[in-house]
């Protein structure tokens, strides 16, 4: 997407902001539904802590790598769009799949299943979110306009994810 020197239309800001919903809603929902793992599946606090901690460690490592990849991509679709698309698909499929847990599989199996799929989910989130946020900053070359774009996107993402939960 080429940087614009003029004001970005409000409709563009709002539609861009809807993408922020995915970045806010899925991790928030993951935290809320984590209670199911503790109460219904008997995950102890150490397991619960590892499920929260380890995927975020992987996320912290992969975010800068994804930024480098996205910044240095040259394709007919641009630097960002294909990653946003692929990341959204990975996030959606993984989020649905990770909750397919059954008590009869056993505690250890369910723990590893959920942990591995949580890591895959956060990889999808990285593939989606890093180029997505960069795309928002590339929509305008003007500082205040970029600030407005991201403020609207954050507002939409935060409020709609709260309504969802």
Labelled PLM ranges:
Residues 2-163:
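Membrane-embedded alpha-helical bundles of multi-pass transporters/translocases
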């Amino acid at each position: 997407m080429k940087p614009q020197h003029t004001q970005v239309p409000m409709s563009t800001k709002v539609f861009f902001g809807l993408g922020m919903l995915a970045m806010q809603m899925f991790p928030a929902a993951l935290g809320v539904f984590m209670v199911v793992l503790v109460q219904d599946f008997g995950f102890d606090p150490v397991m619960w802590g590892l499920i929260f901690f380890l995927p975020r460690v992987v996320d912290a490592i992969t975010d800068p790598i994804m930024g480098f990849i996205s910044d240095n991509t040259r394709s007919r679709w641009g630097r960002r769009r294909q990653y946003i698309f692929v990341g959204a698909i990975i996030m959606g499929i993984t989020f649905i799949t990770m909750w397919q847990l059954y008590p009869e599989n056993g505690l250890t199996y369910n723990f590893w299943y959920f942990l591995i799929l949580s890591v895959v989910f956060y990889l999808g989130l990285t593939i989606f979110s890093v180029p997505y946020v960069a795309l928002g900053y590339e929509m305008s070359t003007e500082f205040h306009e970029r600030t407005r774009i991201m403020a609207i996107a954050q507002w939409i993402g935060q409020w709609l994810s709260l309504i969802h939960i």
